[in-house]
From Swiss-Prot:
CDD domains: Sigma70_r4. Residues 246-321 are annotated as: Sigma-70 factor domain-3. SUPFAM superfamilies: Sigma2 domain of RNA polymerase sigma factors (SSF88946), Sigma3 and sigma4 domains of RNA polymerase sigma factors (SSF88659). Disulfide bonds: none annotated. This is RNA polymerase sigma factor SigA1. InterPro entries: RNA_pol_sigma-70_dom, RNA_pol_sigma70, RNA_pol_sigma70_r1_2, RNA_pol_sigma70_r2, RNA_pol_sigma70_r3, RNA_pol_sigma70_r4, RNA_pol_sigma_r2, RNA_pol_sigma_r3/r4-like. Residues 334-387 are annotated as: Sigma-70 factor domain-4. A motif (Interaction with polymerase core subunit RpoC) lies at residues 191-194. NCBIfam families: PRK07406.1 (NF005643), RpoD_Cterm (TIGR02393), Sig70-cyanoRpoD (TIGR02997), sigma70-ECF (TIGR02937). It is found in: Cytoplasm. The gene is sigA1. HAMAP family: Sigma70_RpoD_SigA. Interacts transiently with the RNA polymerase catalytic core.
Length: 399
């Protein structure tokens, strides 16, 4: 019986799934500085009195390999430095360019909005023609559809497109101002500006000057929406739904507000009460907000190690897998010496197939016999397995 239970334990272990360890984002190493001192040589020759000194050629070869490795590291660092400098210079140049563009007056915004509305009306007619003709219409066909001379039509088209460009370009500083508030959330500053600019273009197309408010007030909502959607869609390896990302943002704001009010870090209960949600839901959302960390993340000053090097592998080794396969084969060989009914009873009783041990009552119902009869069959089968000719095969697996 002891042998069989040990065997069953091995079978259950074989059926268990691997647990995945949730890493705390706090483990994430600090970002690498652009300027770092050059790497020192890793090898230092220590010669003991009894040690034979290597030939000069071999030593030179080793030094050459170290030199090549250091040159490659230096080249990689130089490229990273150039890339960072280029990016910073590009942003600086972009900010200088948009800073030269004059802001619009209220009357100019209204006039541009009218011209943009005329452009959108023309484009709607073009879309209708596209559906009818199943191709892009020519300028002549387009002008005829809007009942306008071709020259006048082209002037209207040019004015509308120029007005849209001017409306967008004159408000690019607004995009930069809003993008700064969303830095360090998973997207680079350039990407935030790009996404915010798309929101600004959408605002220029949807703006209704007859409502009475300024374009910048209206455009702010569209810019924020474009940026937050982009962060939700692109900043994570595992994408979160937009509504969940918005809830995470509200939790962060609430936590910051409570910290200012109380002068300390609020508890989960206090945050959940202010957010009007259960603690279980709050914990689920907080867990969803955690960012995954790559096992290839560099560790240490020299970045010569990876995070995965310090995490214990809890999976089976090849040796364990081979041992379990051999155990399974030997167990099948021993069970094959029993009668079919005895073999089936033991399989069901000790869960040798699916890992679930069934009761005598359950097995009796399957075989349409009493539980006492199943107990007798089980006892007889175990007596056979205790015979030295059978259990000697499995003894080596018992630890």
């Amino acid at each position: 019986m002891t042998q069989l239970i040990s065997i069953d334990k091995e079978q259950e272990e074989a059926g268990m799934t691997q647990a995945t360890e949730l890493l705390d984002p706090a483990l994430k190493p600090a970002e690498t500085k652009a300027k770092r001192s050059s790497r020192k040589k890793a090898t230092t020759a220590v010669v003991e009195p009894a040690t034979t000194i290597a030939p000069t050629a071999d030593v030179d070869a080793i030094d050459d390999e170290d030199s090549v490795g250091e040159d490659e590291d230096a080249a990689a660092k130089a490229k990273a430095k150039v890339r960072k400098t280029y990016t910073e210079d590009s942003i600086r140049l972009y900010l200088q360019e948009i800073g030269r563009i004059r802001l619009l007056r209220a009357d100019e915004e209204i006039e541009l909005a009218r011209q943009i509305a005329d452009l959108l009306a023309l484009e709607r007619i073009r879309d209708e023609l596209l559906e009818q003709l199943d191709r892009l219409p020519s300028d002549a066909e387009w002008a005829a559809a809007v009942d306008s001379p071709l020259d006048e039509f082209r002037r209207r088209l040019f004015r509308g497109r120029r007005a849209k460009d001017k409306m967008v370009q004159s408000n690019l500083r607004l995009v930069v101002s809003i993008a700064k508030k969303y830095m360090n959330r998973g997207l680079s500053f350039q990407d935030l500006i790009q996404e915010g600019s798309l929101g600004l273009i959408r605002a220029a197309e949807k703006f209704d000057h007859e409502k009475g408010y300024k374009f910048s007030t209206y455009a702010t909502w569209w810019i924020r929406q474009a940026i937050t959607r982009a962060i939700a869609d692109q900043s994570r390896t595992i994408r979160l739904p937009v509504h969940l990302y918005e809830t995470i943002s509200r939790i962060k704001k609430t936590t910051k507000l409570l910290s200012q009010e109380m002068g300390r870090k609020p508890t989960e209960e206090e945050i959940a009460t202010r957010m009007e949600m259960t603690i279980e839901k709050l914990r689920f959302i907080a867990k969803s907000a955690q960012l995954p960390i790559s096992l290839e993340t560099p560790i240490g000053k020299e970045e010569d190690s990876r995070l995965g090097d310090f995490i214990e592998a809890d999976g089976e080794t090849p040796e364990d897998e081979v041992a379990k396969n051999l155990l399974r084969e030997d167990l099948e060989g021993v069970l094959s010496t029993l009668s079919p009914r005895e073999r089936d009873v033991l399989r069901l009783r000790y869960g040798l197939d699916d890992g679930r041990m069934k009761t005598l009552e359950e097995i009796g119902q399957l075989f349409n016999v009493t539980r006492e009869r199943i107990r007798q069959i089980e006892a007889k089968a175990l007596r056979k397995l205790r015979h030295p000719n059978r259990n000697s095969i499995l003894k080596e697996y018992i630890r």
